[in-house]
A protein has these predicted regions:
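Single conserved hydrophobic/aromatic residue that forms the stacking wall/gate
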Residues: 148-156
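Conserved glycine-bearing catalytic or ligand-binding loops at nucleotide- and phosphate-handling centers
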Residues: 145
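N-terminal Rossmann-like NAD(P)+-binding subdomain of aldehyde/semialdehyde dehydrogenases
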Residues: 1-106, 133
Length: 156
């Protein structure tokens, strides 16, 4: 397990160091939308498997309800990705500039954090929102949800 985490972390660091333009980010997000649309039926099939597993493990009904996907929820996920893709690029934005009495110019600039770790309950929209927001802001994400409910999240 630790070797796997080490590899994930190394890959995330490499990905973080490869800066891409906002235009390319939006192109990738549009491709992400196309992949979700193309694989919508497969995602729903995998989600059904996850629901069966959740029920067999006697998870609470409210968790199962949040886990469940349908065409409307997938449309909502796609809409969220489109909305995020329209955000201005937050990377390298000058937030504040000032000059010290000695003439030194200082600038506060927004930059990516790097690698963000997220642990959450299995919710398909969270998987998509977190990955999309991190990607748009130039960050990498390592996310962990309920391990026995991952088939559809891998697809998303």
């Amino acid at each position: 397990m630790s070797k796997n985490l080490e590899k994930i972390g190394t890959n995330a660091k490499i990905a973080f160091q490869n800066k891409i333009s906002n235009k390319k980010k939006n192109k990738v997000l549009n491709y992400y939308i196309q992949l979700i649309k193309k694989n919508q039926n497969k995602i729903l099939v995998e989600n059904t498997k996850d629901i069966k597993i959740a029920k067999s493990k006697k998870l609470k009904e409210n968790l199962i309800k949040r886990l469940a996907l349908n065409n409307d929820k997938i449309s909502s996920i796609i809409k969220s990705i489109k909305t995020i893709s329209k955000f201005k690029d937050p990377v390298d934005v000058d937030i504040e500039t000032w000059k010290r009495p000695n003439g030194l110019k200082l600038k506060k600039v927004s930059i990516p954090i790097g690698i963000i770790g997220v642990i959450y309950e299995s919710r398909p929209n969270v998987t998509s929102d977190v990955s999309t927001l991190c990607f748009k802001s130039g960050n990498c994400v390592i996310s962990v949800s309920y391990t026995h409910l991952r088939a559809h999240e891998t697809m998303v």
